[in-house]
Amino acid sequence: NNEAAIIDPLREIQAYIDLAKERNSKIKYIFETHFHADFVSGHIDLAKATGATIVYGPTSMKTGFEALIASDGQEFKLGNATIRLIHTPGHTMESSCYLMIDENGKEQALFTGDTLFIGDVGRPDLAQHVIADLTQEKLAAHLFDSLHNKIMPLHDDLIVYPAHGAGSACGKNMSKETYDTLGNQKRTNYALRESLSKEEFIKELLIGLTPPPSYFPKNVLMNIGG
């Protein structure tokens, strides 16, 4: 019904505006999976240009701009489709995935942000540089729970679209592939092994993490404050 949403928009927004115009569609929502560290988002400028609502998952952080702080499981109508927010803390505390459900009620795609990559999961040591009482161990434990309680129970045919691929500093073992089925990730992603205990997951996730770039915390604060 000529309604569109943008997930995690880049800083340069004109391509989104042009594509929406080309397809005679109105950008209704800007869904952010988390407060990004590796780039400055175009969410504020895109909202000003289109009137779209900026949406984040549950967070205690107060944004410097108007945004809808959604609850876990909250749904948004987009034409005949439904977008359901799934709160998946771990990479950051507000990290959320967006589940796309078609007009027949079938779950079609999961936009996972930095929670689940192809071949990897998000590093759990970034938010601790912004929120003092967080540790990478606590975040890794949250991520384990999010993966096992929120994502892995979803059906295997679901298409996973992460925010990054190989080369990003937000993970350590990302594939060059940009999408995959959830079922294949359950079989091949080291972090989703059923035999992996929470303690083993935390240890394995933290091994080999290099220090994040120094500008990451600055980007987070810019994305929160506007």
Predicted region positions:
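Active-site neighborhood of phospho(di)ester-bond hydrolases with catalytic His/Asp-centered motifs
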Residues: 6-7, 27-36, 55-58, 87-90, ...
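Active-site metal-binding motif and surrounding structural segment of the metallo-beta-lactamase
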Residues: 11-55
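Short acidic-hydrophobic, aromatic-tinged amphipathic segments that line or gate anion-handling sites
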Residues: 68-72
